[in-house]
Every structure is written in structure tokens, then in C-alpha cells.
Amino acid sequence: MTIIIAGPTAGGKTDLALNLAKLIGGEVVSVDSRQVYKYLTVGTAKPEGEYKNGVYNVDGVNYHLVDFLDLDKTYNTGSFTADASNTAYNINKKGKTAIFAGGTGMYMQSYFGGMDVLPKADQALRAQLADIADKEGKQSLHKMLSEADPESAALIPSGNLHRVMRALEIFKLTGKKASELRTNGFADISQNNFMVYIEWDKEELNKRIEIRTQGMFGGMLKETQDMLAKGYTRNSPGLRSLGYAEVIDFIEGKKTKPEALERIVILTRQYAKRQRTWFARYKNMYKADGSALNAEQILAEYAAWKK
């Protein structure tokens, strides 16, 4: 018994998941690579909750796989798949529906459809790539990726050095494109699961992103200041979450507040575009109008799908 809710950032996935869970007595499983981190609530749009009997609870709904990882720890697709498997098993064992909600498409695909096994990190190769980036600039690595794997390069921002290096690493270690390894043999998870995609007009979503960013900046600033005071740095995996580097730049005087806000808005819009591209691969989703979400209607569609 599973429902999947997908869509771009700032699209309303969390609210819909909570409303559905309340209607059917279900529990939510977050599919978000950033909300796993403790302390970062505002900047990751993590729903505010409290722990009850060891489980994060939001307005009476158990909300799993959020707020448990230290900022110095890394989390990946394999970690999520293992954690999600255990979580869903325990939810279903209670006779409840697991509502998977989030925008980290790779996590979603890995759990529901499986993915090719990717090679482990090669530290020597990474050191070589890092040296190239230091001497020739980040753009040089992105250019290398564009030549080796244009599909991955189109999805990865040139400034995201970690992801650019990982895609190049995969290509150099396997001789295959990361984009091919991540798509060949991909099951269309919307064919065998009830999958809701929250759809938005591009301009409407862009406006929502801008408004949300402006509203969360003060909270992100306080969170970031608190984490820096605890000894974390911009290189801590958790603080590499979208937007926090710009807040740190503001704290350090490298950006004005308007500059930091503008940059976060741009990065978030780019992220939303990549999410739309990812989820477009699924051909049998129920598309729900983000401006008029109706949990009861979606449950009716779910009931019809199960027949």
C-alpha cells in the first residue's frame, strides 16, 4: 500500500502528503536528500515537527527519514534505499499506507525501480580532477563532462563541482556515461505504482520560489549562524544544501543580502527545472494541478487505480 507524490521544489508536496495521510491514517516517507539533516529546517523546507516515541511527527502524522543525520555525515542513494525499505515494511506491517513524498528523483527511482550499480569513489582520480579544477577552473571540468557525457552535463550545473567530478569519475572508471548507467534498464515506476505529479505553470512556480526564498532567508541566516557557531563549515555535507553557501557568503561579507537572495532564487529555479526534466521520464503519472490540489480527489483516483 503505497502512494508516491513527486514534483518540483516549492510545489506543495509536503502539504499534500500530510493531507492524504490524515485522510487515510497513513504515514509519510520523505524522499529528500537534504531534509535528512538535523538542524536545517527552514532552508530545506522541512516540515516542523517533534519526536514522539522516537519518530518525527508532524501535526499528528509520522514523518519518516527526516531530521536524523549530522551535518558532517554523507547520505546517498544506497543509504536511502535501505532506510526506505525498512521504513515502508514497518508502516505496511501496521496495515497503513506509506506515502512517499519528495523531489529527489534518483532516490525515488532507486527504491521503486532499481538502478545500475555505480562504481565506488576513486580518491586518486578525484584528486587529479580537483587539481585540474584548481589550476584551470571549475568550468574546465564541466567542459570535459560536456564532451564525454553531454546528457549529464545538461543536468548538472557547472558550479556543482562534486556532481561534475562524480559524473566524470563514473565515465573514466567504467567507460560508460553516467546518464546511460542511470537510465538504461530504468523501470518506469509510474507503471506499477500510483504516482502523483504536482504540475505547475512555469511562471507561477518561479514566483512561488521567489516568495518562499524571501520568506525563509531570515530563518536560514539564523540556522547557518548557529551551525557555524557549533563548528560546522561550508564544506560540511549538510551545509552544501541549496542556498546555505550563499547565506555564508552574506555572513562573510562576500555578498549583499539582495545578491544572496537573487542567487538562491536562480539556483532554486534551476533545480526545479532539473526536477521537471527528471520526472518527465515517467509516462503514467496522475498529474495534479498544483494551484488546485484536492486530496479527496486524489484519493478517489487512487481507489480507481487499485481496482
Swiss-Prot record:
GO molecular function: ATP binding; tRNA dimethylallyltransferase activity
Cited function: Catalyzes the transfer of a dimethylallyl group onto the adenine at position 37 in tRNAs that read codons beginning with uridine, leading to the formation of N6-(dimethylallyl)adenosine (i(6)A).
Gene: miaA
Catalytic activity: adenosine(37) in tRNA + dimethylallyl diphosphate = N(6)-dimethylallyladenosine(37) in tRNA + diphosphate
Residues annotated for substrate binding in this entry: T9, A10, G11, G12, K13, T14
Cofactor: Mg(2+)
UniProt subunit comment: Monomer.
Organism: Elusimicrobium minutum (strain Pei191)
InterPro entries, per the entry: Dimethylallyltransferase, IPT, P-loop_NTPase
Keywords: ATP-binding, Magnesium, Nucleotide-binding, Transferase, tRNA processing
Family label: Belongs to the IPP transferase family.
Record protein name field: tRNA dimethylallyltransferase
Region (Interaction with substrate tRNA): 32-35
GO biological process, one term: tRNA modification
Site residues by UniProt (Interaction with substrate tRNA): T104, R126
Domain of life: Bacteria
EC number: 2.5.1.75
Binding site for ATP: G7, P8, T9, A10, G11, G12, K13, T14
